[in-house]
């Protein structure tokens, strides 16, 4: 019994390195797509007629450059209108009181008025 067991051990030990050195290549099953193959075959077999300039004549509009823009018309055109504009009186919201001599006196007003806040002891 021992001689048979020892033979098996020796046989397995001698085959073991060969099993490790074997390299198995696995391949996947090749799947064919029949519809895709038919489509690609039809694409390869299709011959299109080359397009010419006469084909595009009915489908494309000819290019025309845009028109140059006109100058806008302004209300104040000409030197007379400019002179009339400069001679106009300036309208202001503040009407100055005229003094007895006929000259208007400038009135000085405070343009920045700050209200003094009352400080209370509670706020400190």
From Swiss-Prot:
Coiled coil regions in record: none
Protein origin, superkingdom: Eukaryota
GO cellular component terms, A-Z: mitochondrial inner membrane; mitochondrion; proton-transporting ATP synthase complex
Cellular compartments annotated: Mitochondrion; Mitochondrion inner membrane
Subunit structure: F-type ATPases have 2 components, CF(1) - the catalytic core - and CF(0) - the membrane proton channel. In yeast, the dimeric form of ATP synthase consists of 17 polypeptides: alpha, beta, gamma, delta, epsilon, 4 (B), 5 (OSCP), 6 (A), 8, 9 (C), d, E (Tim11), f, g, h, i/j and k.
Something else known: Present with 6140 molecules/cell in log phase SD medium.
Protein name, UniProt field: ATP synthase subunit H, mitochondrial
